[in-house]
Amino acid sequence: MTNIDAITGSQLMRLWGVSSWIDPGANYYLWDGCCVFAMVKQSGFYDIHVAMDKRRWSECRKAGESILKMFGHHKLRAVIISDRPRVCNYARRMGFGELTIQTLKTVDGRESAFFIMWRDPGEYHGRSN
């Protein structure tokens, strides 16, 4: 896992599927050249955003395990674009719980519906069912 700059991180978020991504002041981490995580510190938790090169989707659990080693001891909120329900399945396997839909204001001031999932602090011990 490599810490990368905001410009590169934002470009990768857009390249790998979040076309409307605007940097919210995140710290970016690149896993094995194919998965970027944007971590945004909030009050008492981190927002976690992820984008991945679709050709290497089969490696998503390894990437998730790596970011959880770094941030799993914090409470995490996964903010997922509402047209990506498969990402919710991935988040569930990484220990994120109950799924809700919330309208949030984005960095550019627009309001959009997102899937929201939470993960309590704790170690990751492999796939959650």
Residue ranges and their predicted role:
Residues 1-19:
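Short amphipathic alpha-helix that is part of the acyltransferase structural core
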Residues 83-101:
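Conserved active-site alpha-helix within GNAT-family acetyltransferase domains
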Residues 20-27, 32-45:
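A conserved beta-strand-loop-helix scaffold within acyl/acetyltransferase catalytic domains
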Residues 71-83:
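Conserved GNAT acetyl-CoA-binding A-motif
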Residues 41-55, 79:
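Conserved acetyl-CoA binding element of GNAT-fold acetyltransferases
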Residues 97-114:
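Conserved catalytic-core motifs of GNAT/GCN5-like acyltransferases
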Residues 3, 19-21, 97-101:
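Short secondary-structure junctions
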Residues 55-71, 89, 93:
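Conserved acetyl-CoA-binding loop-helix of GNAT-fold acetyltransferases
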